[in-house]
Amino acid sequence: AIIKPKYQLTYEDANEILELEPKEEVELIEIKNLLEKSITFRKKQGAIIFESPNSKIKLYKERVVLNKLEKTISQIIVAESMILMGHVTSLFIDKYNLAAAFRIQKLNCKPSEILNRYDDSDIKYIILKQYMGRSYITTKPGIHESLGLKMYVQCTSPLRRYLDLIIQ
């Protein structure tokens, strides 16, 4: 198949469209609504949704500088679409008993215990990340607890990750 995009949509353009919701852009709005349902589903399954902004901490002239980078709606839907694709792909692989590298993660704590213990949202998510178990790869499907999914594969970045290329 040959894909010929009509125009390039930047993150900024997408954010503006998703904020204004013009009738001409119904497809993008429908995609956002679908992915919001995916997030809601994962939350009900115990997913940890990091709602705090991404922070970059740097040491500059013996001072610690903290830059907070707020997540935009377009970044959230791109991330969620990648997660959804990985989940749907894992279901397909499992259904047809295909060989694949499943990503599994077990949590070393109950997230609610940490999230309820601290008031500062930045601190709670930093501490929570320390208690989360590392994900690992196996050939058998299993739960990815922090994503709230019964199975998951990474498959959306074949140029950056060789396993994604194999799965594709």
Predicted regions and their residues:
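Electropositive polyanion-binding surfaces
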Residues: 1-168
